[in-house]
From Swiss-Prot:
Subcellular location: Secreted; Cytoplasmic vesicle, Secretory vesicle, Acrosome; Cell projection, Cilium, Flagellum
Pfam families assigned: Lys
GO molecular function: lysozyme activity
Protein name: Lysozyme-like protein 4
Protein's GO biological process: fertilization; fusion of sperm to egg plasma membrane involved in single fertilization
Xref: PANTHER family: LYSOZYME C, LYSOZYME-LIKE PROTEIN 4
Highest taxon of the lineage: Eukaryota
One cellular component term from this protein's GO annotations in UniProt: sperm flagellum
Main function: May be involved in fertilization. Has no detectable bacteriolytic and lysozyme activities in vitro.
Domain C-type lysozyme: 20-145
Gene behind the chain: LYZL4
Length: 145
């Protein structure tokens, strides 16, 4: 009896840390529906790869890099200095809008970023992990779009 009470109490105290994490195929579908398939010449696989290496598919991720003095927001860890209202606001939106699991604002801002001269190279993680990968197709394996 005591053990079940203790386990029940522990169950109330433990909050899953990955509740906001989306599945790979869910991310692929949302990005596809948002028009990122072949946007500016980048395949959907590139976008899914980027999302994984930036946030592990967590649309509510916030990462503060105190060394470089920036904060990254959302699925693509969009940086505050240039893209949202805590900086130059080139995407014309609040940084908190980038934390919505529906991904609409995130996709809108990502399109603005990738139209720039650096394209997806604006994300160092894409350059390191996705750009020349010969296994990009795996990011869509088993996904129904």
């Amino acid at each position: 009896m005591k053990a079940s009470v203790v386990l029940s109490l522990i169950g109330y105290l433990v909050v899953p840390s990955d509740t906001a994490v989306l599945g790979r195929c869910v991310v692929a579908k949302k990005l596809h529906e948002g028009g990122l398939s072949d946007f500016e010449g980048y395949s959907l696989e590139n976008w899914v790869c980027l999302a994984y290496f930036e946030s592990k598919f967590n649309p509510m991720a916030v990462y503060e890099n105190s060394r470089s003095d920036f904060i990254g927001y959302g699925l693509f860890q969009i940086r505050n200095h240039d893209w949202c209202d805590h900086g130059r606001n080139r995407c014309h939106m609040s940084c908190s809008a980038l934390l919505n699991p529906d991904l609409k604002k995130t996709i809108e801002c990502a399109k603005t970023i990738v139209k720039g001269k650096r394209g997806m190279g604006a994300w160092p993680s894409w350059t390191l992990n996705c750009q020349h990968s010969d296994t990009l197709a795996r990011w869509l394996d088993g996904c129904k779009l």
